[in-house]
A protein has these predicted regions:
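A cross-kingdom marker for long, charged
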Residues: 166-234
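Solvent-exposed, polar/charged alpha-helical surfaces in well-ordered, non-transmembrane soluble domains
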Residues: 40, 59, 101, 122, ...
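Extended amphipathic alpha-helical interaction segments
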Residues: 88-173
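Immediate post-signal-peptide N-terminus of mature secreted/exported proteins
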Residues: 1-4, 16-23, 109, 204, ...
Length: 234
């Protein structure tokens, strides 16, 4: 979400997942993925200073956490603290970050790796979805950051594959295959980092990964991520 703000795009409330839909998710699979999706919308709202909306999305995350048996983490005190800090963005960022770090830790401690993996997948899907809603007006920096998500997707697929297979994890890996195919149009070449000393004595680091892509690839990424996102966010 910070990346989206720095890239200069405008907040788009219409792109967010509908709050009212949360009551319809009764399976662990849908609750887990949509918790990640709503968490992505929560972060997006916080970063763009949509204060009231941020608290509403936090409340929605609380409902899904109740269904997953971890409702004590996003409790009334946390909601109240977020509400009291709604006009202090940095405080809200800290509250959201700490909360989802604790949630992920609880899932892992309780052997709920499936939930942890689906939560991570949902959050990543929503982040890319939000970043690709306005490709025509996107900055070059945002387009580059979207293309670089190929590396994050590779890591996500590896994470999902590291858990004991379940039908829900298999469903997610299958759903992400078209997204993987779209990202195949991105090539990333690792170049060794080189340090050079400038005239004023500062050290300049050059090199690092070189990312290549074209507009057709970004369009394919945008279309494929929308399909998988809307498959779960019904």
């Amino acid at each position: 979400a910070m990346l989206l703000e720095r890239s200069g795009i405008q907040f788009d409330a219409d792109a967010l997942h509908t709050l009212e839909n949360a009551v319809g998710y009764s399976t662990t699979e849908l609750q887990s993925v949509n918790l990640g999706i709503y968490a992505g919308d929560l972060s997006y709202s916080v970063i763009f200073n949509q204060n009231q909306q941020s608290v509403e999305y936090l409340n929605t995350c609380r409902r899904l956490c109740d269904g997953l048996g971890v409702g004590d983490i996003i409790n009334a005190d946390l909601i109240s603290r977020a509400d009291n800090n709604r006009d202090v963005r940095d405080s809200l960022v800290d509250i959201v970050t700490d909360t989802f770090y604790e949630l992920n830790g609880r899932f892992r401690e309780n052997g709920m790796e499936e939930v942890s993996g689906l939560l991570a997948a949902g959050g990543w899907i929503e982040g890319v979805y939000l970043g690709t809603r306005s490709l025509n007006s996107s900055t070059a920096d945002l387009k580059l950051r979207i293309a670089e998500q190929k590396m994050t997707l590779d890591n996500l697929i590896g994470l999902l594959g590291s858990y004991a297979p379940t039908p829900a994890l298999t469903n997610m890996k299958e759903a992400l295959r078209p997204v993987e195919a779209a990202f195949a149009g991105v090539t990333i070449t690792e170049n060794p980092a080189v340090s050079t000393a400038a005239v004023d004595g500062t050290v300049v680091i050059s090199g690092g990964p070189e990312v290549n892509y074209d507009e057709a690839t970004l369009t394919a990424i945008s279309e494929s991520i929308a399909v998988v996102r809307n498959q779960y966010a019904q």
